[in-house]
Amino acid sequence: MNVYKRADFWAKKAAAAGYRARSVYKLAALDKKYSLLSRASRVLDLGAAPGSWTQYVLGTAAACTAVCAVDVQPIASDIQDARLQRVQGDLCAADTRARVACNAPFDLILSDAAPRTTGNRTVDTSASACLAAGVCAYVNFLSSDGGLVFKVFQGSEHLAILTHLRAHFGAVCSFKPPASRPRSCELYVVARFFRGTCGK
């Protein structure tokens, strides 16, 4: 199966299942491998639009699990659930973090956010690292032993992020789900068992 047919497979599967995007199967693979949602009663989804990861959490986690979904774009209006709190704003902005803080602490922080790509690997990798830093700015909203999962483009910056997180989490690794395009440089950082306050 070539790259484009494989991508089409995941997109068609997502549409048939009622999910907003094919990326839902990346989270499903992460959850299967790391049991992300097994103990999560409060989840923060950063860069959530159009909403497939939020859909997955609401449909898979325990019935009592609450989700705070953040994006500068509105989350799909037909995703309706009493457990869902929407926060519209730039995830990297201080005022957005202040609004999210009202819902903390979280057992799990998720982010599938990615920068607009230019086709220049160096530029795109750097932009991804900057966005990842914005996601990591929320880490102190985690409860003890909480988890953090986010997308980053592979490169020297991503290795530096892993090194930084290992000082604050009991287990840190990276993973490329089967639903990722084979030629994509995207990886997902999985940090588990938060030890406490993480300095900037």
From Swiss-Prot:
InterPro entries, from UniProt? RNA_methyltr_RlmE, RNA_MeTrfase_FtsJ_dom, rRNA-MeTfrase_E, SAM-dependent_MTases_sf
Q: What class of enzyme is it?
A: transferase
The entry's localization annotation reads: Cytoplasm
Q: Origin, by domain of life?
A: Bacteria
Q: Mind telling me which residue stretches traverse the membrane in this protein?
A: none
Binding positions for S-adenosyl-L-methionine? G51, W53, D71, D90, D112
Q: Which GO terms describe its cellular component?
A: cytoplasm
Q: Which PANTHER family match?
A: PRE-RRNA 2'-O-RIBOSE RNA METHYLTRANSFERASE FTSJ3 (PTHR10920:SF13), RIBOSOMAL RNA METHYLTRANSFERASE (PTHR10920)
Q: What does this protein do?
A: Specifically methylates the uridine in position 2552 of 23S rRNA at the 2'-O position of the ribose in the fully assembled 50S ribosomal subunit.
The protein, known as: Ribosomal RNA large subunit methyltransferase E
Q: Which gene encodes it?
A: rlmE
